[in-house]
Design a protein with these regions (language model features):
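Intrinsically disordered, low-complexity and often Lys/Arg-enriched segments
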Residues: 1-4
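Compact soluble domain cores
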Residues: 10-64
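Basic/aromatic recognition patch in beta-strand/loop cores that engages polyanionic ligands
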Residues: 60-84
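Enriched for short, Lys/Arg-rich terminal
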Residues: 77-80, 84-97
Length: 97
């Protein structure tokens, strides 16, 4: 299922410092492949706006879990950024589009 408005509000407030980033292994690999630091990741997250929002969709493994997808840029590279709420932390997925 998909929708055209974010499921989660205030992602920037939840992810306000490097210590707040909770990353999947896939996200860590994507960040490393792009050549980003965690500081770069945090900067991208803090600069996201509704103009970057792409879609919300349910997770393949569990249709009750929503994921918000944003498109952004970093140093001329187009990024696909996905957030998912799990307990009290967001899991962040980064990859090049």
């Amino acid at each position: 299922m998909e929708k055209r408005r974010p499921h989660y509000d205030l992602i920037q407030a939840e992810l306000h410092c490097i210590e707040a980033l909770s990353l999947t292994v896939t996200a860590r690999h994507g960040i490393k492949a792009i050549g980003m630091t965690l500081g770069d990741v945090l900067q991208v997250i803090q600069q996201l706006s509704m103009g970057n929002f792409y879609k919300s969709m349910t997770a393949q493994a569990d249709s009750r879990v929503w994921q918000d997808v944003y498109h952004s840029q970093w140093k001329g590279r187009r990024l696909y950024v996905k957030f998912q709420k799990h307990e009290k932390y967001f899991i962040v997925s980064f990859k090049e589009r």
